Amino acid sequence: MSSKGGSSRLGSKDLKKMTSRTERELRDSGRVRGEVERVEKRLRATAKVKEQPPTGDYKRRALASPGETAAPTFLVDSRGIPRKTSSTAPRKATLRPASSSPRLASSSRPTESTLPSSSSRALQGASSSSSSRPRRLHESASGRGGSGGSAGELRQEKKRLPELEAAEAAPASCVVELRDVTARKGRTSPATPPETAGSSVCGQGSHARTAEKLEEGTASHRDGSRRGSVDAETWATPGDGSSSHEFESSPQREERMQPQETGRRELSSEPRSGDLTKNGGDGGPRRHSCAWRKWREHMIQSFDITTHPFPPRGDGSPRRGKFLMIFLTSSVLFFVFLQELVLNVTTFNGRCMSPVLYPSHDAPESERTPRVISFGYGACEHNLGVSLFRREETKKDPRGRWTPGPLTERCASGRCASDDGWPSDLVQRGRAQRSPAAFDSPNPRVFSSLGALDTNKVRNYGEMFRVVWGMFLHGGWMHLLLNVSCQAQTLWILEPAWGFLRTLSLWIVGGVSGSLLSAVANPCTVTVGSSGAFYGLLGALVPFSIEYWDHIASPAWFLFCVSVLVMVAQFGNMVGVQGVDNNAHLGGLIGGLLFGFATIRSVHAFRWQGVAERMASSTLFWWMFPAEKRRSLREDNLQRVAREREERSSGRIPPPKFVWKFRGHEREWCVRFAAAVGLVTFWSVLWLYLLVPSYYESLSSPPGNFSFLGSTGCHCCRVQPFPGEEDKLPAFHPVRVNRGLFWCFVSEGVANLFCGRSSALNRGADVYGQTRQFEEALGDLPSARAGEAPLRIAKEEGESASVWQRLVKSAKKTYNAVLGNTTTPAAPSAAELAQQTRAGQ
């Protein structure tokens, strides 16, 4: 560019740049002009719909002319509370939403004639005094030339377009996230109250609430969700210009009005108590209703109460972070089972974990002294007669007579984890302790070492931890996966509604209840597994369905399916499945059922009238009710709902109680109290029969594990030698070593031998005084100690009973046990014992 004689000449490049810039500005100005015209058109349409005469004590005079208004000016502070009103003379005014003020709405909006035409391409101010008015959104572009203004002004207009779009939208406080708690779908949808004559877009009574807030001044609001609703429901129209106020921006206001609670919210569209008082009504009931709502929100915020069991569908996973109990229990159970496998390998199937080497019993006397092997598995290899790695074959040592055994491999689980006990050439009768393993489980011998539920060790050695720790162990991969999958499916329903602490307490109570009943009713076997806790979750589904009766789509069907599932699971295991502890299942079911009712939040929704109506309308029970009865039930239920709604609306409800979540109903407290007493009684009786000798000794013949084929039988007694054989038994005989213990045996013959009811010495006894009968009886001990409980009836020798005879015998035994007619064989007298001994000799 060059300058000469006061004139300037543009170069070709500069001229191109200016031309392209001018074309771009013209194109942008046309686009902006079109957007402004569309926004102004929508504003005029909205103002025409909203222009209705106000009602109430604060009626405004009709507009004298299309461009005049006599509405008072409502000025609000930064918190959204009205501070001052000015009633000025009518003056010419047009709609001018302020850029820095929140989006406001009022019933006295200007008419279509008060708005500028679309050709003006600008929104004019509402007052001639620019010093006292808020900043304009758009400058008039009529005097800017054909281009529609400079480039800076065009950019400003483009920036203000979103504000114009927001100005014609509904106020933010009118669209409240309202969770429909009566609908069973549990969805969340933005809800707006209906428009009525004399009310704004946000609901009825906006002018009355506005006037009340003007009188209150800086008084605090009754409801947090109602804060800022007046400034969102009233469009600010400047007055005489005596005072101006800088409003907070809409994003700041929306952030301030963000609700803190995650539960339900209600629209604050009902009139306040002051409105009723001014109109001649009684504001007391409204105060109670408002106090109730405030108390409910306080409880939700303070205690994080879940008011709806089914979270709404939204962005992302609505249940994210809701299943801590599922992941916690599953991970713990898997970790403990892996520890079982590790211990099964390192202890040689539970047979050896000590570094002490015990020489053979036929070794020279000078070499029979046990010794400690400080490193390696040499001690266990010698004691078990195996070798873990290939060694050079050597001849037998003439002094120690020890040669490395055959090469063997250790397994964590499966058939290879089975063993034949201890070698007979090293351990007397070592082969009698044979222990087989299932295809998916470690050797059952390790369960007792890991802390499985063993009633005999709990009573005699005080190992109380077995009552709790036994439910973390599992017998195999199939057992573990089945329990974890069933628990996850049940916790998927319970945990989002009941929360982590309540669900964790339920899981522990169910597991301990199952362990207690199993330990008392079947003390002969070793029990592992968390199926008792799972049945506790199943039992809790019954109070869950009653507690959330109004939120479940088909609660009657849900309750029916839960009942059928429990019966099928319980009775299915009683058909003849071996290795299943039905006592633990039954105890967990009772514990979970009682705990669920003891902690139930409300039984308010479970009324017979509503239940009968649901049953009459269901496809399962409709045939039980005639058509007239079904119609009558439905009408009665609708009348009851309408009556309760009228009572709540009129204020005939009691003030909020302290314990809000329990609703304070006497019937509900009776249910909780009865269930809590039942649970405490159930636990107390079981603990007494588990730990107190005077109680469990009176139960000498517990029922054992039961099924439709009968029961396994269980026989308990004090271990003692047969009278007259105390000095004849060897020093390390099992009877002499364990003398005085109260032990329970599966076989009645074994119990008679160890409890002194039958003689262990007989013709043909070996060096230890053990007869063939005694050795055969000992064959039942490995299965009893290893936790294998074959489902059979304990019968006398030579007795062959059919299935029908077993059922009859089991029924008679149960009948006698219930009536207290169980006969225990009396201990023989000294004369009878002497006579039996002489006859045997």
From Swiss-Prot:
Annotated segments matching region Disordered: 1-289
Species assigned in the record: Toxoplasma gondii
Source taxon at top rank: Eukaryota
Low complexity: bias regions: 1-10, 95-132
Regions crossing the membrane: 323-343, 464-484, 492-512, 526-546, 571-590, 673-693
UniProt xrefs under Pfam families: Rhomboid
InterPro entries xref list: Pept_S54_Rhomboid-like_Rom4/5, Peptidase_S54_rhomboid-like, Peptidase_S54_rhomboid_dom, Rhomboid-like_sf
Protein name per its UniProtKB record: Rhomboid-like protease 5
GO CC annotation: membrane
Gene: ROM5
EC code(s) of this entry: 3.4.21.105
